[in-house]
Amino acid sequence: MRLAKLFFGLAACTLAATPFTAVAQQPIVIKFSHVVAHDTPKGLAAEYFAKRAGELTKGKVKVEVYANSTLYKDKEEMEALQLGAVQMLAPSLAKFGPLGVKEFELFDLPYIFDNYEELHKVTQGPVGQSLLKKLEPKGVVGLAFWDNGFKSFSANT
């Protein structure tokens, strides 16, 4: 009799600690912050990512896109990411230099790539993967490189 009570008590405790999968779970919310307008290539890509994440996960993941520095200003975003206040960014690569990964500053040099094909050979190959891995010790996981246009110079002559 005592053993039966003990078994029943343990079973009840185990059941109480087990989450019920039949109960609707809240979606995972990812805050995606960037500093450009909605209608720019980066802004449109962020919106598309949010849409596809919702579709592919059947609503289990919801991506909230905060454009135009509405959530954090340009200089605040990286710190917010490291603190977990946002989960995704689409920063310019120059933002990783102050984080201690100076190799990313290479991409700010003018005329380093002649065209997008050369750029993609670097960013989508072993060099790009190596650069993204350098972010991990800083508490940041680099997922991919997004094109942000080439630097241009102009002058009054």
Positions of PLM-derived features:
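Extracytoplasmic "Venus flytrap"
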Residues: 31-48, 68-73
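Immediate post-signal peptide segment of exported/extracytoplasmic ligand-binding proteins
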Residues: 20-33, 54-62, 136
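Short, polar/charged alpha-helical segment
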Residues: 39-64, 126
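N-terminal glycine-rich cofactor-binding segment that shapes the pocket for flavin-like pterin cofactors
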Residues: 28, 62, 69, 73, ...
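Contiguous mixed-secondary-structure segments that line small-molecule binding/active-site clefts
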Residues: 50-51, 79-82, 87-88, 92-157
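Short helix-initiation/N-cap motifs at beta->coil->alpha
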Residues: 65-79, 148
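Bacterial N-terminal signal peptides
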Residues: 9-18
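Bacterial N-terminal signal peptides that target proteins for export
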Residues: 1-10
